[in-house]
Amino acid sequence: MDAVLEPFPADRLFPGSSFLDLGDLNESDFLNNAHFPEHLDHFVENMEDFSNDLFSSFFDDPVLDEKSPLLDMELDSPAPGIQAEHSYSLSGDSAPQSPLVPVKMEDTTQDMEHGAWALGNKLCSIMVKQEQSPELPVDPLAASSAMAAATMATPPLLGLSPISRLPIPHQAPGEMTQLPVIKAEPPEMSQFLKVTQEDLVQMPPTPPSSHGSDSDGSQSPRSLPPSSPVRPMARSSTAISTSPLLTAPHKLQGTSGPLLLTEEEKRTLIAEGYPIPTKLPLTKAEEKALKRVRRKIKNKISAQESRRKKKEYVECLEKKVETYTSENNELWKKVETLETANRTLLQQLQKLQTLVTSKISRPYKMAATQTGTCLMVAALCFVLVLGSLAPCLPAFSSGSKTVKEDPVAADSVYAASQMPSRSLLFYDDGAGSWEDGHRGALLPVEPPEGWELKPGGPAEPRPQDHLRHDHADSIHETTKYLRETWPEDTEDNGASPNFSHPKEWFHDRDLGPNTTIKLS
């Protein structure tokens, strides 16, 4: 930047005037030390208050420390545009040129426009914002379009003031409405609108700054962007306006009159050891102390709000706990009642069971006894019926009898008979029978006195006569072994389906001279 400005001395850039060194300026020299006529003193006071609010609005954030080192440190400039020492006054003829006017375009570059006049552009834009008031509403878009038209219509703007020839920066309507408004009396506002160019460019010598200055321009205040502090100011002003413990911001920006502080602010000022300001305008020390006190009050309000919310949350939780506890107790009571009722019902059920068993056990036992008796009688009747049918079943009755051999009778059977006979009956041992286990020897058949052989059934034994009993057994065995073998279609138990006897095929044999027995 120095290389760009070397071919252009201060006399060529600003003929007939000298400009101040930017290294000697601080944050309070741009907006607080401008000299205006007496009828514009209110504007100077308003600009001083506005500059202080604008510069310190960055430190209103409660996140920052109260004793921020940024408040006491010296701000550095990017690069000073002018290094030479100049006088502290400007005449109407030597107003600084606008970057819109070409000054030897063959020797200058775009860096000069953005470097040497960047601070002036931002400064003038801040001053233009401050002029807006409720008495004269200005549309930002219309004003910017009008200023742009005027700039295009009149290229040489050397005769205009820096405030009037710089366009208003474009901002959203919401941001423009949030700017603090300075109340001004109508007569003074009309006088401000009629000022001349000579009155605007008259500037007194700047007193030495509190931060000091250096010849090489290493320390100078940085240019503050106009749009960035607007939003924090809007947020803080909204918080202040909603709090009853803080004074409204428009009351602190008055030019004259008494200053009415809240009781909380006064108490905090006394506790911090600061004097209580009573009149406007405020000094820098008073303003700094008041800002610190207001910041503490804001922190206190936010802490109270957080504690209030926490208390409400805890109270809500306590109410829920009480409600749930009462419901739990009621449920426990219901459970105990149900358990008691269950025990009572169980006892009644046991009593009923004992009563029922005591009353029903005797008839049940009697019925069971009667049933058993009936079954036994039925079984006995069945046995009797079977017993009555036993004579009709020779096969069943003959199988259970035991054959007794009589050795004397067996010898007499196979002995040669002295009596003449047609044939000799014999039993072939080679021919199998269906009852091999009951084979017996042939016994002599001698019918007893008064006994006749029945062809349809077995002979009925007579135990009173031993001889007759033996003869009956021998006759029965003879008839069993000498008859025809059973057919092939007999059942497994050896019984024939029909009890018809085969035809007679045996020969007659004379047993004696007097008796002849016909065997079947």
Curated annotation (Swiss-Prot):
Main subcellular location: endoplasmic reticulum
Short motif (S2P recognition): ranges: 391-394
Record location of the Glycyl lysine isopeptide (Lys-Gly) (interchain with G-Cter in SUMO2) cross-link: 183
Membrane topology value: Single-pass type II membrane protein
Residues the record marks as carrying a glycan: 498, 514
Sequence motif: S1P recognition, positions: 422-425
KW Manganese (keyword) present: no
Region ranges (Disordered): 72-98, 201-258, 446-467, 484-520
Record CDD domains: bZIP_CREB3
Top-level taxon of origin: Eukaryota
Gene Ontology cellular component annotations, sorted alphabetically: chromatin; endoplasmic reticulum; endoplasmic reticulum membrane; membrane; nucleus
Spans annotated as Basic motif: 291-320
Ranges where the record places region Required for transcription activation: 1-60
Cleavable signal peptide: none
Region of interest (Leucine-zipper), ranges: 331-352
Keywords tagged on the record: Activator, Developmental protein, DNA-binding, Endoplasmic reticulum, Glycoprotein, Isopeptide bond, Membrane, Nucleus, Signal-anchor, Transcription, Transcription regulation, Transmembrane, Transmembrane helix, Ubl conjugation, Unfolded protein response
Chain segments annotated as coiled-coil in the UniProt record: none
Intrachain S-S bonds: none
Modifications made to the protein after synthesis: N-glycosylated. Ubiquitinated by HRD1/SYVN1; undergoes 'Lys-48'-linked ubiquitination, followed by rapid proteasomal degradation under normal conditions. Upon ER stress, SYVN1 E3 ubiquitin-protein ligase dissociates from its substrate, ubiquitination does not occur and CREB3L1 is stabilized.
Biological processes annotated in GO: endoplasmic reticulum unfolded protein response; extracellular matrix constituent secretion; mitotic G2 DNA damage checkpoint signaling; negative regulation of DNA-templated transcription; negative regulation of endoplasmic reticulum stress-induced intrinsic apoptotic signaling pathway; negative regulation of fibroblast growth factor receptor signaling pathway; negative regulation of gene expression; negative regulation of sprouting angiogenesis
Biased composition range(s): Low complexity: 209-222
PANTHER family reported for this sequence: CYCLIC AMP RESPONSE ELEMENT-BINDING PROTEIN A (PTHR46004), CYCLIC AMP-RESPONSIVE ELEMENT-BINDING PROTEIN 3-LIKE PROTEIN 1 (PTHR46004:SF1)
Subunit structure of this chain's protein: Interacts with SMAD4, the interaction takes place upon TGFB1 induction and SMAD4 acts as a CREB3L1 coactivator to induce the expression of genes involved in assembly of collagen extracellular matrix.
Family according to the record: Belongs to the bZIP family. ATF subfamily.
Protein name per its UniProtKB record: Cyclic AMP-responsive element-binding protein 3-like protein 1
Species, as recorded: Rattus norvegicus (Rat)
